[in-house]
Swiss-Prot record:
This is Large ribosomal subunit protein uL23. Keywords: Ribonucleoprotein, Ribosomal protein, RNA-binding, rRNA-binding. The lineage of its organism: Bacteria, Pseudomonadati, Pseudomonadota, Gammaproteobacteria, Aeromonadales. SUPFAM superfamilies: Ribosomal proteins S24e, L23 and L15e. GO terms for cellular component: ribonucleoprotein complex; ribosome. Belongs to the universal ribosomal protein uL23 family. The keyword Ribonucleoprotein applies.
Length: 100
C-alpha cells in the first residue's frame, strides 16, 4: 500500500492540450502531469483514491524540456513526465464540478 502523502505528490496537474481533449472525448482517457519518479502503479493508485474512479490502464512517457533563448542566453526547461490514464467504461472525472 502506498502512503497517502506520496499519493498526493504523484499527480501534479491535468495536462490540457488539443490532443488530450480529443483523447478524453474519444477514448475516456485523462492526461496528467506527474512526478518524474512516479511509477504506473503509483499513478493508478493515486487516481483511483483521489477521484474515486476505476482505472483500466496507465501509460507514461518522459517529455524532454525545450531549449529556450532569451537574447544571447540559451537555457533549457526542465524535463517532465506525463501519464495517459484510461478509465473503465462508465467512469468519468469532472474537474469543473470538483472546483465548486
Amino acid at each position: 500500500m502506498i502512503r497517502e502523502e506520496r499519493l498526493l505528490k504523484v499527480l501534479k496537474a491535468p495536462h490540457i492540450s488539443e490532443k488530450s481533449t480529443m483523447v478524453a472525448e474519444k477514448q475516456n482517457t485523462i492526461v496528467f502531469k506527474i512526478a518524474v519518479d512516479a511509477t504506473k502503479a503509483e499513478v493508478k493508485a493515486a487516481v483511483a483514491k483521489l477521484f474515486e474512479v476505476e482505472v483500466e490502464t496507465v501509460r507514461t512517457l518522459n517529455m524532454k524540456g525545450k531549449t529556450k533563448r532569451s537574447g544571447a542566453r540559451v537555457g533549457r526547461r526542465s524535463d517532465w513526465k506525463k501519464a495517459y490514464v484510461t478509465l473503465k467504461a462508465g467512469q468519468d472525472i469532472d474537474f469543473m464540478g470538483a472546483a465548486e
